[in-house]
Amino acid sequence: MFRGSITALVTPFRQDGSLDKKAFGALVEWQIAEGSSGLVPVGTTGESPTLTHDEHQEVIRLCVEAANKRVPVIAGAGSNSTREAISFAEHAEKVGADALLVVTPYYNKPNQRGLYEHFAAIARSTSLPIFIYNIPPRSVVDMLPETMARLAADFKNIVGVKDATAKLDRVSEQREACGPDFIQLSGEDATALGFNAHGGVGCISVTANVAPRLCAEFQAASLRGDGARAIELQDRLFPLHKALFLEPNPAGAKYALSRLGRLENVLRSPLVTVEASTAEKIDAAMKHAGLLN
């Protein structure tokens, strides 16, 4: 159920900064039509830090409603407050999400015992499958494989990880610690091919916002063992993977989607739109991938 190209959705805004619900619904429809195998609303790429609680919950509800069980919705439910994360988890379950993506607490820097207790409390609060989101560059904490293994052993609904460490050996370490059934999804587009080779089964992808069909085809080729096709698609996508992250995410993805006419190029402060020089590089990468003429 949770494998392949799973899109970490952007949250579209109007020029006045309000949620663009129409554009969001259309984005969900396009993603499903293009072959994405899952959707993640309100993660890092969804600008969760600048959404109000009501907006956070509304975006998840809209995504669940638009997806209508055609693909799984893994709702962003992370916070550096355990109580707040539990509240997000309970709401996501209530509105019909299929799973939760819970980031390791950021800024307050809990130790491994604190990480265990945080995820244990969330797991006790919901019956939904939980994916640990381990992203040390943003959270400044790194959940170690041993801690992950304890959680997976103690809670049946802690089923996998979105790994954004970009350490390919970590996939094998987590497979050894947590077992082969623990679902490992890459959180880093550029290294997703190597991630799968180590035992991963997909990617929660930023690039899939912009190139959903190519990303879906890439993941399908990789997972069926068609290395030649996977590398061919990797070569088409790699410049785009790089260009979209020249400035803080999701500025690159939103610019690219605006070039495709999918949404307004609007972010919420303190994030800002990409510089002109970056826009040129994204345009070139989109042309290389065959997304622009």
From Swiss-Prot:
EC category: lyase
Binding of pyruvate, residues: T45, I204
Principal localisation: cytoplasm
Active site (record annotation): Y133 (proton donor/acceptor), K162 (schiff-base intermediate with substrate)
Entry keywords, A to Z: Amino-acid biosynthesis, Cytoplasm, Diaminopimelate biosynthesis, Lyase, Lysine biosynthesis, Schiff base
GO cellular component, one term: cytosol
NCBIfam families referenced in this protein's UniProt entry, alphabetically: dapA
Descriptive protein name: 4-hydroxy-tetrahydrodipicolinate synthase
